[in-house]
Amino acid sequence: MLPKVQNAEQIVALDLLLTQLERTNGLEVGRLGIEAQIENAMGLINIDAIASASPRIQSLIFGPADFMASINMKSLVVGEQPPGYDTGDAYHYILMRILMAARAYDVQAIDGPYLGIKDLDGFRRVAGRSAALGFDGKWALHPDQIELANEMFSPRQEDYDHSEMILDAYDWATSSAGGAKGAVMLGDEMIDEASRKMALVVSAKGRAAGMKRTQTFTPPAS
């Protein structure tokens, strides 16, 4: 993990050092990955160049504490809204900017730590924000935060079941048995290719978490 990344040149330099290290130790070149932590305004401004600077990039990580200091945010509680700001989420643009770059360059988006290790409600609230946007995970600083992080970044059982039902229904509808249609009704919901893509995201998260489906798809009677 490379902290306080500000530009692509820092990634390129680290890539070169890792290549030398791999060759010296007889390792496959490219085996070692890079996680870039965005902790200041300059890093956020250059995030597209950072994300695309090396094929070693595996994730973009938000570093909230140093970032808050770098933009003079008036808060002493890492990850919480600054006092007096009541018109929305002060972190929304930052999180979305990191997420957009991560998705554009096919790397993971990881939310940074929540320092109130005894404030589990606060951790749940802040983790829920980035999980809802589509982040892949969040740093945990204390064992008590791990279970909550796994919970927040895994889909609810009903959402996981529904995603698998959508995939099954769409696969059936587009097959010859289902009439090779481009859309189909699942209950009161019309599902199509866009629905399938959305379901794939939820399904993948559920499968990665080891979830088991509790519903099965039954093709409608012809």
Question: Where do the language-model regions lie?
Answer:
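Expand to "…catalyze enediolate/carbanion chemistry for C-C bond making/breaking, isomerization
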Residues: 1-222
